[in-house]
Amino acid sequence: MATPTPFQSQIYRSLPEIERADAIVERISKAIALGLLKVGERLPPEAALSEMFGVGGATLREALSELRERGVVETRRGRSGGTFVVNQPEPETDIMREWFLSTSISEIRDIGDEHSAIAAATIRLACERAEAHDFDRLQELARALVLAETPETRASADSRFHIELAVSAQSPRLANAEIRLQEETVRQLWAPFTVAEAYDPERATAEHLELVRAVAQDQPERAQKLTLEHIRRNIFHLIDTKLVLGYAQSRPSSPATAPDGSSSAEAAMIQEGQ
């Protein structure tokens, strides 16, 4: 079997002993949602998948059957056959809504703190270690976001950009941390029920492209500043969405504004920090 790529090593790593078929379904579905596996991409052969996941053939076939029933993959026969990704997983709107309602503002802020710490180190290493061919790829991924037309494909394009940027830093641990953080919040960021001023793909794309330019020009201070501002806006958006969902039955659907003109997210973070 060929040596797996870094992405394959993350997606197809060994599974826990319990509910292995369900774990495979979840792992592959999340990889597609994060953009690690793209629509049209062929999965490794079943024998290789079984070996990488550390499962028997029957368990793997059960998982692939479930993914086919969900319309996420299809298996084609013939010389050029195999199992191919054909669709994004269906959005788990109820689960995302419950995440907003059950996650406190302090917890969302803490996610932002962790992401800021990881991203600050990652972007500085990217300025040092990224290679020339990385920049064209990152620009292509940045532009893919504004071309995406659904919340699911926007979340996928967004996370794939940030993960590829982390990969360019050539630190597997930091790249894995970025994958984990993207998995935790990116679908909520682009959720279809977000606040009235929906998260803007054009603005996010512009920020991504500006970040690529800073890395390409080896400007670590500027790149870090842009990264932290980007994460801060993301966290404020998540908090705004939480507040809107939490107050939906008693307040207007548009996000509240504090007396000084700041967003409801800023006001809530200040209040919780006191």
Swiss-Prot record:
May regulate the transcription of the rmpAB operon. Pfam families: FCD, GntR. Residues 18-88 form the HTH gntR-type domain. GO terms for molecular function: DNA binding; DNA-binding transcription factor activity. This is Putative HTH-type transcriptional regulator RmpR. Keywords: DNA-binding, Transcription, Transcription regulation. Gene3D superfamilies: GntR ligand-binding domain-like (1.20.120.530), Winged helix-like DNA-binding domain superfamily/Winged helix DNA-binding domain (1.10.10.10). Residues 46-65 bind DNA. Coiled coil: none annotated. Residues 250-265 have a biased composition (Polar residues). Residues 250-274 are annotated as: Disordered. PROSITE patterns: HTH_GNTR.
